[in-house]
Amino acid sequence: MMESFDFVEVKVPAKAEYIGVVRLSTSGIANRMGFSFEDIEDLKVAISEAITNAVKHAYEDSGEGEITIGFGVYEDRLEVMVADHGGSFNLGEVKEDIGPYQQDDNIEELREGGFGLFLIDALMDKVEINSKYGVIVLMTKYLHETEVGQNGDQISTTQ
């Protein structure tokens, strides 16, 4: 039986100026889940890098096309997919056909311009890539037990 999750999908034009919209969506979803401030910042940077790579490499800064961002909201993690060919995707199907990113993979074949992918890999707990139809990057960030839950009390430095 497949694990249940909520799925949120955002489509934006393949233009750098829409990265902020996705960063706000990411922040809202991750905050609701109870991620720490640091983890939310890591998520925003990693997702921004993936979108920037799609804008630059898939569409060559033409502004044509769109980028689809899918958020799989699980109890213990957030899975984020960035697809550079704009079509909707089925999270389950893509996950079956995706493989882990290996640091010795030929990055040029993945159209992911070196540094961005290494940064994404460093910030996320797991990174997988499917380059069969464009490039789909699946990034996973686990929610650690020590984080403040969505219904948790605010942390205070005063007594």
Describe each model-derived feature in a short phrase.
Residues F37-S62:
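Conserved ATP-binding N-box helix of the HATPase_c
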Residues M1-V45, G149-Q159:
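Bergerat-fold GHKL ATPase/HATPase_c domain
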Residues M1-E9, V55-Q159:
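Conserved beta-strand-loop-beta-strand hairpin that lines the nucleotide-binding pocket
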